[in-house]
Amino acid sequence: MEQLHLLLASGGGSKASTTITPFCLARDHASTSSPSPAAVAAPAPPPEATSGSEQSIHGSGTGLQSSEAMIKAKIMSHPLYPSLLRAFVDCKKVGAPPEVVGRLSSLAVVTDVPQYSGDRCLPAQQPAADPELDQFMETYCYMLTRYGQELARPIQEAEEFFRGIEEQIDSLALDEDVSYDYEDEVAGGLPEKSAAFGENEVTTTTRRHLMNKYSGYLNSLWTEISNKKKNSTGHLPRDARHKLLQWWHLHYRWPYPSEAEKAALAESTGLDKKQVTNWFINQRKRHWKPKPAAAMDAGFLQMHPRYGASSSSSPAAALRVEDGGGRRSAYHPRGGP
């Protein structure tokens, strides 16, 4: 538009100053007559023409400014202008510092006033309906709204991710507090100085100090507990096992110790009565094979010849004699008691 005004202004000045000769007439005139320096040189424009061109340029600039002001007035007087400005401010808020967000929010509140005083566009001065302007405002409102949503989505996802990480860290910190409390209870509790503080006031440095202080005691206690577990699973000490084997070899024919014998073995070996009982049960299952009744009777008579002339030829009678007659033996050979 400005170039059009300039072209019109320059055209008017040239008509007022000189007369343009067509190219064909100028060529015929040059062939018939010799050119003169005054005719070749273009005459200087008069001062009136120069001042007229400057006035036309100034007038074109003023016209452009007035057209821009008119377009601004149309946009700001449009009903969708507050929505357009609010969408633009929302885009500016994404990722901005809190103080900047506050200023932008206050600006959006000011622009929500029906009569916006940017160029003092009153309702009486509102232009007529413009379908092209309506489409422009609707399109850019939609575009700015979508753009603000796309800008805010990564920030929202990042905030959700950080919240999840913080929750995991808090849960780990709670588990660590519980573990430290358990270890402190095993070690005998906190010292008197640290017991005065609350659980939340115990720092990580204090916990590390306590762990370093009681770590040796905890390790020795754990070793002792592990050894007791091993012993309770059947791994008896060597001396105790040796004494039990001695009794086993001496009573191999009938390796069933009585309750009194179990108590004596438990006292001599340092084991529990239950451990002694379990050891004999396992030993009989693995290493004891009872002999037939006839072989046992013959072997018994050979080992105890004084019972051979007894009035009763049954080994059961001999066993009853050996037990003192008042208590029956647990062994009953073939033939019944």
Swiss-Prot record:
GO cellular component terms attached to this protein's record: nucleus
GO molecular function, one term: DNA-binding transcription factor activity, RNA polymerase II-specific
Location of the region described as Disordered in the Swiss-Prot/TrEMBL record: 34-63, 307-337
Domain ELK as annotated: residue spans: 205-225
Residue spans of biased composition, Low complexity class: 309-318
PROSITE patterns: ELK (PS51213), HOMEOBOX_1 (PS00027), HOMEOBOX_2 (PS50071)
DNA-binding region of this protein: 228-291
Keyword Oxidoreductase assigned: no
Subcellular location: Nucleus
Gene3D superfamilies to which the protein is assigned, alphabetical: Homeodomain-like
Protein name: Putative homeobox protein knotted-1-like 5
Record-linked CDD domains: homeodomain
Similarity remark: Belongs to the TALE/KNOX homeobox family.
Keywords from the UniProt entry: DNA-binding, Homeobox, Nucleus
Pfam families cross-referenced by the UniProt entry: ELK, Homeobox_KN, KNOX1, KNOX2
UniProt cross-references to InterPro entries, sorted A to Z: ELK_dom (IPR005539), HD (IPR001356), Homeobox_CS (IPR017970), Homeodomain-like_sf (IPR009057), KN_HD (IPR008422), KNOX1 (IPR005540), KNOX2 (IPR005541), TALE_homeobox (IPR050224)
Major localization listed first in the record, in broad terms: nucleus
